[in-house]
Amino acid sequence: MTDTTASGTARVRTRFAPSPTGFIHLGNIRSALYPWAFARAMGGDFILRIEDTDQQRSSQAALDVILESMQWLGMEPDEGPFHQMQRMERYRAVLAQLQAAGHAYPCYMSVAELDALREKQLAAKEKPRYDGSWRPEPGKTLPPVPAGMSPVLRFRNPQGGVVAWDDKVKGRIEIRNDELDDLVLARPDGTPTYNFCVVVDDIDMAITHVIRGDDHVNNTPRQINIFHALGKEPPVYAHLPTVLNEQGEKLSKRHGAKPVTQYRDEGYLPDAMINYLARLGWSHGDDEIFSRAQFLQWFNLDHLGRSAAQFDEAKLRWINAQHLKAMADDALAALVAAQLQRRGVAQQELANGLANGRLARICALFKDRCDTTVALANWAQVFYADVTPAETERALHVTEAIAPALDALADALSGCEWNRPAIAAAFKQVLASQGLKMPQLAMPTRVLTVGTAHTPSVDALLELMGREKVLARLRNR
């Protein structure tokens, strides 16, 4: 029996190995989160490896998005990115090593022959597999080598015994070697295949723990056998359950998954994303909201879940709102300023707002009403740009009957000190003189100054807006 063991006291080294063939979504990035967190928790190293041997589908644009997504989330690697396409010489050397040791052999079976074999096996209700026609055996006569044909190189898989490993998520898994055929290590043009490259990379990069999606479980016994053929012990494996979308399908580009960078653009916070993704397959008791530092302190492989996790955008927004509320106002102000600058607000005006704390106070006033930084920037924008109230709210609150009171309020505000107590006193004065209640005057004031009747305290609102803007918006109605 072939078995794997933990890597003893070796320094923990994990990896994330994406293919740059499209945008990276939340299911992909979760496969980076756990190895990154485990390396950080154990004081180890996190390696980024780019599996780009599929040159027809790989692109620099896709790679840039992977790097951008990881940088935004603060999951930058200790080493890499390493590119498989830059390691071809090393792969060729190891292929030659395997062939010289009798662990690999050339196979000249054509595609047509393989197709015919597959059809025959399916007709006989057998599992389709390579039949070993070109596998050298003592006393066996191999078919004649076809003229002008380049062979594939196949791995000589053990024919007896069991390959087994203790998966940190799924428990013990055992596969009989006679269920595995001789997989292709290199194509006719000499290009090495995925399962071979992965093993060579994991050996050369001294990977101790492979934490990846459970769609790789079927690859694992084949990879373990290649490790042993090369005289190396395989790493510890942890195969993560699938992430499902809100309809219960596997989260994928085909089924509506969004790029990670889109969540950034929609106003999600990196630490909130880390929090949410961590809970999408791992738990620490009943803790739902935690910081990045807490996650890295608590994380281990023992609490990874075995069941598929389902993405829930409403839960993500709720978690984001909790992180937004807990975030320091000046840090939020910097994020909001960047968004407002992209919307055309003058850089100097924003710089002044950051320097004098005004933008931080705006964020403090509105952040409890927001679940994204985009929503918060929408509120902040009314302090820097012209406002057009919704016609329904204007018609409801800014009536001819209230016009005298609005004029009186503008007059009172033009001569008072500009702070919350003085603004509140001006309102009381006008309410008393006009015989009104606070909502009758506060609602139209809110509509005219920020475009909606539903805001925090009106005196706090007006103080932050500044006398000049407030008077202009009250009078130019």
From Swiss-Prot:
Motif interval(s): 'HIGH' region: 18-28
Substrates-to-products reaction catalysed: tRNA(Glu) + L-glutamate + ATP = L-glutamyl-tRNA(Glu) + AMP + diphosphate
One biological process term in Gene Ontology: glutamyl-tRNA aminoacylation
Keyword Protein transport appears in the UniProt entry: no
EC number, as in UniProt: 6.1.1.17
Region described as Disordered: 128-151
Residues bound to ATP: 253
Localisation: Cytoplasm
Location of the motif 'KMSKS' region: 250-254
Keywords: Aminoacyl-tRNA synthetase, ATP-binding, Cytoplasm, Ligase, Nucleotide-binding, Protein biosynthesis
Superkingdom, natural source: Bacteria
Gene3D superfamilies: 1.10.10.350, HUPs (3.40.50.620)
CDD domains: GluRS_core
Enzyme class: ligase
Basic and acidic residues: compositionally biased ranges: 128-138
InterPro entries: aa-tRNA-synth_I_cd-bd, aa-tRNA-synth_I_codon-bd_sub2, aa-tRNA-synth_I_CS, aa_tRNA-synth_I_cd-bd_sf, Glu-tRNA-ligase_bac/mito, Glu/Gln-tRNA-synth, Glu/Gln-tRNA-synth_Ib_cat-dom, GluQ/Sye
Listed GO CC annotations: cytosol
Keyword Nucleotide-binding belongs to the record: yes
GO molecular function: ATP binding; glutamate-tRNA ligase activity; tRNA binding; zinc ion binding
Functional note: Catalyzes the attachment of glutamate to tRNA(Glu) in a two-step reaction: glutamate is first activated by ATP to form Glu-AMP and then transferred to the acceptor end of tRNA(Glu).
HAMAP family: Glu_tRNA_synth_type1
Subunit structure: Monomer.
PANTHER family for this protein: GLUTAMATE--TRNA LIGASE, GLUTAMATE--TRNA LIGASE, MITOCHONDRIAL-RELATED
Family to which the UniProt record says this protein belongs: Belongs to the class-I aminoacyl-tRNA synthetase family. Glutamate--tRNA ligase type 1 subfamily.
Protein name as catalogued: Glutamate--tRNA ligase
Organism the protein comes from: Verminephrobacter eiseniae (strain EF01-2)
